[in-house]
Regions:
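Conserved RNase H-like, two-metal-ion catalytic cores of nucleic-acid enzymes
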Residues: 97, 291-366
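Terminal, non-catalytic protein-protein interaction segments that mediate quaternary/complex assembly
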Residues: 240-261, 265-274, 342-371, 380-388, ...
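Acidic, Mg2+-coordinating catalytic module of metal-dependent nucleases/exonucleases
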Residues: 166-235, 246, 255, 431-505
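Conserved DEDDh/DEDDy metal-dependent 3′-5′ exonuclease domain
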Residues: 90-94, 99, 103-107, 119-122, ...
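Short helix/loop capping segments that flank catalytic or ligand/cofactor-binding pockets
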Residues: 30, 232-233, 250-252, 261, ...
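Acidic, low-complexity intrinsically disordered tails
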Residues: 500-526
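Long, highly charged low-complexity segments
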Residues: 257-315
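Metal-dependent nuclease catalytic cores that hydrolyze phosphodiester bonds in DNA/RNA
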Residues: 1-116, 246-274, 278-280
Length: 526
C-alpha cells in the first residue's frame, strides 16, 4: 500500500472536496493532500463563462442586492455576518459561511424579516438535478451550523421552453425558472451530514489509494488524477466494459475483478455485447456480425456520407433558439454513386450572424438528387428537425433533408462490430483508426471538439478580421470533410467494397433525413 503524509495545514471542507468524495474516495484523498491543477477543456471553460453570465443575469432580478467582498473566505464570512446582523440588506451575493471545518459560498442569499435566510442557487441546466440538491443541502448544513436559520431553498435554472427573440439581451423573467426545493433538501440533509463526516474522516485514511479505477473516473466529469491512476491499470480495465452498470461494477470489484481478462464469457447476466467483447479481446481479433455487411449493402444510391457539425450553448443567440438547443454551423458530404464516382461538397459558417438558413439551403441543394444518408450519429438530424419551427421561410429545404432515408453507423457498429481497441465509448475517429488505420488530422488548426469550440468562439467575436473568419470557416469545413471521409472509408471496408474503393481512389474527387432506418434485432446467444 502507498502511504502519504497528511497535510500540515488542515484544509476546510468545501463543495469541491465534497463532490470529489461523491465521485471517488481516492480522488477525495488526493484532492485533499495532493491537489493537481486541472486542464480545463474549452467546453468546460465556456460553461464556466456562461455560468458567470447567467449568475449576473439572475442577480439582476434581486433589488437592493449587495456583493460580499473579501480577499479570503474568512474575510468574506466576517463581512457576511456583519451584513446579516445589520438587517438593512435584502439580498447578499456571494455570501460566505464557515463552521465545523467547512466553508460554503452562496450564489444569492435573501434575508427575511425575521432574520431567517433563503438560499438561491443558479444553475445552467434545464431541470433540477440530484447533485444540485446535494450541493444545497451542504450549504444549508454549514449555514445552520454557523448559527443561522434557513427558511427556504430554491434553484434558479433555464426554462427549456424559452424562445430567444434575438440579440444579446435576456430577460430573467422569461429565461429563468425558480423551483422551491426546500422539502427535498430537508429530506436529504441527514444523509449529506453523514457523508460529510465520513469524507472528513476519509482524508486521514490513505487506504483509499488502493482503490481500483472505475466508470466513476469519468462521470460526471473526468477525474484530474485519471492519467496517473490509469498507469496502474491492466490492458483491458473493467471500466471499459460496455453496458456496465454501477451495480454490476460494484459486484465485480467486491469479487476482486478489475481486469476483463479475468471474466468468464459464460458468466450469467452478461449481455450479448459484453460476451462478444470478451471474445474479441481474448481471441485478439475483430468480430463482425453478418448483419453489419448486410445492412451496409442494403442501401440506396447515391450514398451521401454526411458529417453535420453542431455546437451547443446554454444561452441561445438567435431568433427562436432555445437554451441548450444544438446549432449547426457546418456540413461536409462525400457522395458516392453506384458507378463508384465520388464528389465532395461542404459548407461552413464562421461569423456572429445566424448560420442556420444558409446551412439548411445549401445542404438541401446537395441532397436534392435523392439517395441515402450515411451518418455517424443520427442525432444530428434531430438538430436539423429543430430548425423547422424557428426557420419558417426555410421549411421546404429542411424537409428535403429530413426526407432522405438514413443509416446510423455508430449504432450499427456498436451492436455488431467488436474490436480489441474499441472498448467503452466509441467515437468516429477512434473507430476509423482501429478498423481502417486512418489517423484523424492533427496538423490543421481545427481537429477536435475543443479546437472547434475555440474557432467558433473566435469567429463570433466582433473584432475578428474578415480574413481570419474566412480561414476559420475553411478549417471548420476541412474538419467536417475529414469526418465524412472516415465514414466513406468505414463503409467501403466493412461492406467489402475494395474494388470500388480502388476505382474511386484512382479518380480525383470533384469539389463541389428522413425516417429512421431500423436495424435488425440484436442476436441472442444460443
Amino acid at each position: 500500500m502507498k502511504t502519504r503524509s497528511t497535510t500540515k495545514v488542515q484544509r476546510r471542507f468545501d463543495k469541491r472536496l465534497f463532490e470529489a468524495g461523491q465521485q471517488c474516495l481516492k480522488r477525495l484523498y488526493l484532492d485533499y493532500h495532493e491537489p493537481v491543477e486541472e486542464q480545463e477543456s474549452e467546453g468546460r471553460r465556456i460553461m464556466s463563462e456562461t455560468g458567470k453570465q447567467l449568475l449576473q443575469l439572475a442577480r439582476g432580478a434581486f433589488a437592493r442586492g449587495v456583493e460580499v467582498e473579501g480577499k479570503t473566505i474568512d474575510q468574506a464570512a466576517d463581512k457576511t455576518q456583519q451584513l446579516i446582523a445589520a438587517g438593512s440588506v435584502f439580498a447578499l451575493f456571494g455570501a460566505a459561511f464557515v463552521a465545523d471545518g467547512c466553508e460554503v459560498r452562496t450564489d444569492i442569499l435573501v434575508r427575511q424579516k425575521d432574520g431567517s435566510l433563503d438560499i438561491f442557487e443558479v444553475k445552467s441546466g434545464t431541470k433540477v438535478k440530484g447533485r444540485y440538491l446535494t450541493d444545497l443541502a451542504l450549504q444549508a448544513i454549514v449555514i445552520e451550523r454557523a448559527g443561522h436559520k434557513v427558511h427556504g431553498v430554491y434553484v434558479l435554472y433555464l426554462d427549456k421552453t424559452y424562445k430567444h427573440t434575438g440579440g444579446t439581451d435576456y430577460s430573467p423573467k422569461g429565461l429563468v425558472k425558480s423551483a422551491d426545493v426546500t422539502e427535498r433538501v430537508r429530506r436529504i440533509q441527514p444523509r449529506v451530514a453523514e457523508q460529510l463526516a465520513a469524507f472528513q474522516r476519509q482524508t486521514k485514511d490513505d487506504s483509499a489509494l488502493d482503490l481500483p479505477t472505475g466508470t466513476f473516473c469519468t462521470a460526471p466529469f473526468p477525474c484530474p488524477h485519471l492519467a496517473n491512476c490509469s498507469k496502474q491499470e491492466p490492458e483491458f480495465p473493467l471500466r471499459s466494459f460496455p453496458d456496465l452498470t454501477r451495480e454490476i461494477e460494484r459486484e465485480l470489484h467486491e469479487e476482486g475483478i478489475a481486469d476483463l481478462m479475468q471474466l468468464d464469457e459464460a458468466r450469467p447476466s452478461l449481455t450479448f455485447r459484453q460476451r462478444r467483447t470478451l471474445q474479441c479481446i481474448k481471441q485478439k481479433e475483430t468480430i463482425r456480425e453478418p448483419f453489419v455487411k448486410e445492412e451496409l449493402l442494403h442501401v440506396e444510391f447515391p450514398l451521401h456520407f454526411l458529417s453535420i457539425a453542431t455546437t451547443t450553448e446554454a444561452l441561445p443567440r438567435f431568433v427562436g433558439q432555445k437554451p441548450w438547443q444544438a446549432l449547426p454551423y457546418a456540413w461536409a458530404c462525400e457522395t458516392l454513386t453506384a458507378g463508384g464516382a465520388v464528389t465532395q461538397s461542404g459548407f461552413a459558417y464562421a461569423d456572429k450572424d445566424d448560420p442556420r438558413p444558409e446551412f439548411a439551403q445549401s445542404l438541401a441543394k446537395q441532397l436534392a438528387s435523392g439517395g441515402m444518408l450515411i451518418l455517424w450519429n443520427a442525432d444530428s438530424l434531430e438538430c436539423v428537425r429543430s430548425l423547422l419551427e424557428p426557420l419558417a421561410a426555410d421549411k421546404q429545404a429542411i424537409r428535403v433533408i429530413l426526407a432522405r432515408p438514413h443509416l446510423d453507423l455508430q449504432r450499427l457498429l456498436e451492436s455488431g462490430l467488436f474490436h480489441p481497441n474499441l472498448l467503452g465509448e466509441r467515437g468516429l475517429a477512434a473507430t476509423a483508426k482501429a478498423i481502417c488505420g486512418i489517423d484523424a488530422p492533427t496538423e490543421q488548426d481545427v481537429f477536435d471538439e475543443d479546437s472547434v469550440l475555440r474557432a467558433i468562439q473566435k469567429a463570433s467575436t466582433p473584432r475578428t478580421r474578415a480574413a481570419t473568419k474566412e480561414k476559420i470557416a475553411a478549417d471548420l469545413r476541412s474538419y467536417a470533410q475529414s469526418q465524412a471521409a472516415m465514414l466513406l472509408a468505414l463503409w467501403r471496408l466493412l461492406s467489402d467494397k475494395q474494388e470500388a474503393a480502388a476505382e474511386a481512389a484512382a479518380k480525383p474527387a470533384k469539389k463541389t433525413a428522413g425516417p429512421r432506418k431500423q436495424l435488425p434485432p440484436t442476436p441472442v446467444e444460443d
